């Protein structure tokens, strides 16, 4: 079972809102997930990102692989640097 940290889309048509979730890569994008780590709203200026930093670091240390978009969000929040230092 390969676990990914990725975005699950929500919101209305043309008004996306995303949840940062941990999910098995075999599950559908907006389907079942293991744990919710935060939220991302790209429509706000600047984009709103909230993360549970401790849980995110815990999953990264367990071997969960973030998608490219989530990795970019982790870098902007400073979580990726903390993960690399550990």
UniProtKB/Swiss-Prot annotation:
Coiled coil: none annotated. One of its GO terms (molecular function) is structural constituent of ribosome. InterPro entries: Ribosomal_bS16, Ribosomal_bS16_CS, Ribosomal_bS16_dom_sf. One of its GO terms (biological process) is translation. One of its GO terms (cellular component) is cytoplasm. It comes from the Bacteria. Pfam families: Ribosomal_S16 (PF00886). Keywords: Ribonucleoprotein, Ribosomal protein. Belongs to the bacterial ribosomal protein bS16 family. This is Small ribosomal subunit protein bS16. The gene is rpsP.
